């Protein structure tokens, strides 16, 4: 059975998006919004939710390197609550948090090694990070 899964890499000004039907993760896009205007960012997410009709939303959860919950993870929790308030057809059981430590750094390194310009690196960094988060989730299901 195929599943429709969307991954989110939530930042203060962007949401990186990736998609999978349950096998291969693909980066989709990056939603950009005014800093900390998560309402604006989440409203832009609606067209992707309609198009891909996901049953699971995988969210990168940025724990601190010592495995504690810091400001960034609290910000993600806040955005998840906003998401659930805005999109009533989803429930908290459909939201899966994946430890995303270092995924943005790995995404940056991949883009640097691909010899992309700084402008293109900035354009693709967040959606690639979302793809890496989604790949971590897909791998965890195989264990």
UniProtKB/Swiss-Prot annotation:
<protein>
    <recommendedName>
        <fullName>Putative pre-16S rRNA nuclease</fullName>
        <ecNumber>3.1.-.-</ecNumber>
    </recommendedName>
</protein>
<dbReference type="GO" id="GO:0005829">
    <property type="term" value="C:cytosol"/>
</dbReference>
<keyword id="KW-0540">Nuclease</keyword>
<keyword id="KW-0690">Ribosome biogenesis</keyword>
<dbReference type="Pfam" id="PF03652">
    <property type="entry name" value="RuvX"/>
</dbReference>
<dbReference type="InterPro" id="IPR012337">
    <property type="entry name" value="RNaseH-like_sf"/>
</dbReference>
<dbReference type="InterPro" id="IPR006641">
    <property type="entry name" value="YqgF/RNaseH-like_dom"/>
</dbReference>
<comment type="function">
    <text>Could be a nuclease involved in processing of the 5'-end of pre-16S rRNA.</text>
</comment>
<dbReference type="GO" id="GO:0000967">
    <property type="term" value="P:rRNA 5'-end processing"/>
</dbReference>
<comment type="similarity">
    <text>Belongs to the YqgF nuclease family.</text>
</comment>
<dbReference type="InterPro" id="IPR037027">
    <property type="entry name" value="YqgF/RNaseH-like_dom_sf"/>
</dbReference>
<keyword id="KW-0963">Cytoplasm</keyword>
<keyword id="KW-0378">Hydrolase</keyword>
<dbReference type="InterPro" id="IPR005227">
    <property type="entry name" value="YqgF"/>
</dbReference>
<dbReference type="GO" id="GO:0004518">
    <property type="term" value="F:nuclease activity"/>
</dbReference>
